[in-house]
Amino acid sequence: MTHDAVRLDSVTRTYGPVTALDEVSLAFPAGTFTAVMGPSGSGKSTLLQCAAGLDRPTSGSVSLAGTELAGLSERRLTLLRRERVGFVFQAFNLLPSLTAEQNVALPLRLAGRRVAKARVRQALQQVGLAERARHRPSRLSGGQQQRVALARALITRPDVLFADEPTGALDTGTGREVLGLLRGMVDREGQTVVMVTHDPVAAAYADRVVFLVDGRVHGELTGPSADTVAARMTRLEAVPC
């Protein structure tokens, strides 16, 4: 029976007079790939941050890997993120003074865990960069740097991988390679992926697409294609505020 890797129940997040999320209830089943889309300012990144424990909701509850986040101290929340969550962002956020393999090993070192070289090499092998293990970021292309960031996110074997516009800084061909890696990890490894994107082609790699408008869920698509996603987005962008 499939369980939920992440669950949000009636989550609201306000910043002063602005309501970024408004009574959002969503589940992200384990082993699935979900894309989150919506017009600019719809609450996509806020949803990801609340779901990942990077931001606390004003009201409502978030459960991550079976743990309710609301009652956790900042220290316990940080430990949970280190051990159970992976992150990939538009900016690669690699440390320039470290090699690819050292960047990948960093989450294990921060968590005080033993760094097995074979495990680091396996993570780089997964993303097709084993031969670049000793290269620093300055010697890697943008696509290669994002693949290192992906290997780093997966080194702790997280329950869920959150990706915020992971192809936003990449050219079309390189972006498709990264999306193919994400799709493959879901299919082969049962990895759970939640991805924020503005690109209908990127969203079509997912099992389903959840749409937000003005901080509220505004429907979803399963088995999406780029055309069906683009058509839905066109309609949503015409919704009056």
Map each language-model feature to its residues.
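Conserved ABC transporter NBD signature motif
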Residues: 60-68
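Catalytic Walker B motif of ABC-type/P-loop ATPase nucleotide-binding domains
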Residues: 161-164
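Short coil-to-helix segment of the ABC ATPase nucleotide-binding domain corresponding to the Q-loop/switch region
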Residues: 98-106
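ABC ATPase NBD coupling module
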Residues: 69-86, 227-231
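The feature captures the beta-strand-to-loop junction immediately N-terminal to the Walker
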Residues: 37-39
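Conserved catalytic motifs of ABC-family nucleotide-binding domains
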Residues: 157
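Conserved ABC ATPase signature
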Residues: 136-146
